[in-house]
């Protein structure tokens, strides 16, 4: 392996918009500001909204689905 070709790997502070901070290592070399982290992300906090797509599926079927025609009674 060649010496002195890799960038410096330094410890930096990551700050979230919610105010949470943590330390990590990066070649960036300066503090990093992020919008969402594991403290405030809806997936990790349990405040995730589940989108009900049943209405969309029914709307699609009405628009593009095959229409079921009544068959004449045998007799």
Curated annotation (Swiss-Prot):
Task: Give me the residues that bind Zn(2+), please.
Answer: 16, 18, 37, 40
Alphabetically list the UniProt keywords: Metal-binding, Ribonucleoprotein, Ribosomal protein, RNA-binding, rRNA-binding, Zinc
Read off the Pfam families from this record. Answer: Ribosomal_L31
Q: Does the keyword rRNA-binding apply?
A: yes
Does rRNA-binding appear among the keywords? yes
Q: Which InterPro entries match?
A: Ribosomal_bL28/bL31-like_sf (IPR034704), Ribosomal_bL31 (IPR002150), Ribosomal_bL31_A (IPR027491), Ribosomal_bL31_sf (IPR042105)
What Gene Ontology cellular-component terms does the record carry? ribonucleoprotein complex; ribosome
Note the SUPFAM superfamilies from the entry.
L28p-like
Q: A single GO molecular function, which one?
A: rRNA binding
Please share the entry's free-text remark on the cofactor.
Binds 1 zinc ion per subunit.
GO biological process terms held by the UniProt record: translation
- PANTHER family named in the record: 50S RIBOSOMAL PROTEIN L31, CHLOROPLASTIC, LARGE RIBOSOMAL SUBUNIT PROTEIN BL31A
Fill in the subunit field for this protein: Part of the 50S ribosomal subunit.
Q: Which family does it belong to?
A: Belongs to the bacterial ribosomal protein bL31 family. Type A subfamily.
Q: What does this protein do?
A: Binds the 23S rRNA.
- Protein known as: Large ribosomal subunit protein bL31
UniProt organism field: Nitrosospira multiformis (strain ATCC 25196 / NCIMB 11849 / C 71)
Gene for this chain: rpmE
């Amino acid at each position: 392996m060649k010496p002195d070709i890799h960038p410096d790997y330094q410890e930096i502070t990551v700050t979230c918009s919610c105010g949470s901070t943590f330390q990590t290592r990066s070649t960036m070399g300066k503090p990093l500001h992020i919008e969402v982290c594991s403290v405030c992300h809806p997936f990790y906090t349990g405040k995730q909204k589940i989108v009900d797509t049943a209405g969309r599926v029914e709307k699609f079927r009405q628009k593009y689905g095959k229409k079921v025609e009544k068959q004449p009674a045998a007799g």
